[in-house]
Amino acid sequence: MRVGIKVLGCPKNEADCEILAGVLRERGHEIVFDVKDADVVVLDTCAFIEDAKRESIDEIFSFIDAKDQYSYKLVVKGCLVQRYYEELKKEIPEVDQWIGVVDPEEIANALEKGTDLVPNRPETVYRYRKRIDLEERPYAYVKISDGCDRGCTFCSIPSFKGSLRSRSIEDITHEVEDLLKEGKKEIILVAQDTTSYGIDLYRKQALPDLLRRLNSLNGEFWIRVMYLHPDHLTEEIISAMLELDKVVKYFDVPVQHGSDKILKLMGRTKSSEELKKMLSSIRERFPDAVLRTSIIVGFPGETEEDFEELKRFVEEIQFDKLGAFVYSDEEGTVAFNLKEKVDPEVAKRRQEELLLLQAEISNSRLDRFIGRKLKFLVEGKEGKFLVGRTWTEAPEVDGVVFVRGKGKIGDFLEVVIKEHDEYDMWGSVT
């Protein structure tokens, strides 16, 4: 069976699909990278917010339109299916097979049988198997846990991802060791909430233990941690990230808002002052630390006063990177039933206003790197420039660095930063 895999959604889906590709190859199937060569196309979907659902539906119909030309079987899997299986099966009969949130071995079994598989409870924590790169790049996402027990009122993820389920430190270490042998230079740890890693297995927050284990591995590489829930970002986790030399000093902390009223409605436990104190303490200990966050505007009940409070919060913290998203009303969440919905046009205006403010802040924050030497990871080439990132940027969500000089994908180079705009930097090899 020749299988093509198309991934939508978050980096956790990318990690899952690379494991699935490895399982299928182990079973004798061929992984192809062009749908015209495939007997089966597997489309992995996202169902987090309305935009993600719309993108998934659009992609399903794009692949349906191409079926007659290329004669492949279309299999749709993942979060959208886990959440809306009955409706999808009824409304889109052109799809040949539906698979929910399932362990890669079980997905492979279902593909071989040709039967639908949507469990009542998600099953996505797997033991490590050899991965196959679906894209050529010098970094890899490693999923350390799945599911979430936090109960944020706006979030639908627990309804289709289930409760927290962590992989063992030994299993994750095995995966990372293999990735390093294959030449990966950056290991990016992902989960719905990385701060909760290990609570179910070890009865404690085990992220510091995992980081220490990975930091002890041989080789020159970066370790990056994403999705640090602010309510449970402890002093021990912060200290481990600041003290371990291979862990980049990059803190992805999705605070979601800066108004105490809205934070409480969101089900968050830390106040804006507590958030400020925590984030400021990171900068006090490591002034160059990069702080990234995510913000939701237009949450039910958000007034102009709340929004102004949010802007003051953002100005005070001076985040290096910030993603701003309009609230998505998701059925099955607590927030779905809240009154005082914000007009979509008002929410969109607030998003644009916040992003303009952040562009000024980001531009100012990058000034500190002008004239300095930074370690640079080559990811490709664009015209006369090498393109890649320093430790200050995460892939896909942040800017990039354009560098004059020679190098190949996966090289670490020392570069001098010469200029920047709000998001990207330019420099040259020293």
UniProtKB/Swiss-Prot annotation:
Q: What is its EC number?
A: 2.8.4.4
Q: Where does [4Fe-4S] cluster 1 bind?
A: 10, 46, 79
Q: Looking at the keywords, is 4Fe-4S present?
A: yes
**Can you state which reaction this protein catalyses?**
L-aspartate(89)-[ribosomal protein uS12]-hydrogen + (sulfur carrier)-SH + AH2 + 2 S-adenosyl-L-methionine = 3-methylsulfanyl-L-aspartate(89)-[ribosomal protein uS12]-hydrogen + (sulfur carrier)-H + 5'-deoxyadenosine + L-methionine + A + S-adenosyl-L-homocysteine + 2 H(+)
Q: Which UniProt keywords apply?
A: 4Fe-4S, Cytoplasm, Iron, Iron-sulfur, Metal-binding, S-adenosyl-L-methionine, Transferase
Q: How is the cofactor bound?
A: Binds 2 [4Fe-4S] clusters. One cluster is coordinated with 3 cysteines and an exchangeable S-adenosyl-L-methionine.
Occurrences of domain TRAM (ranges): 367-430
What GO biological process, any one, is recorded here? Answer: tRNA modification
Which residues of the sequence carry a binding annotation for [4Fe-4S] cluster 2? 148, 152, 155
Q: Is Cytoplasm tagged as a keyword?
A: yes
* Location within or outside the cell: Cytoplasm
Highest taxon, organism lineage = Bacteria
Give start and end of each Radical SAM core domain.
Answer: 134-365
UniProt main location, coarse: cytoplasm
Family in the record:
Belongs to the methylthiotransferase family. RimO subfamily.
HAMAP family attached here?
Answer: MTTase_RimO
Q: What does this protein do?
A: Catalyzes the methylthiolation of an aspartic acid residue of ribosomal protein uS12.
- Protein known as: Ribosomal protein uS12 methylthiotransferase RimO
- Lineage of the species this protein comes from: Bacteria, Thermotogati, Thermotogota, Thermotogae, Thermotogales
What is this protein's gene name?
A: rimO
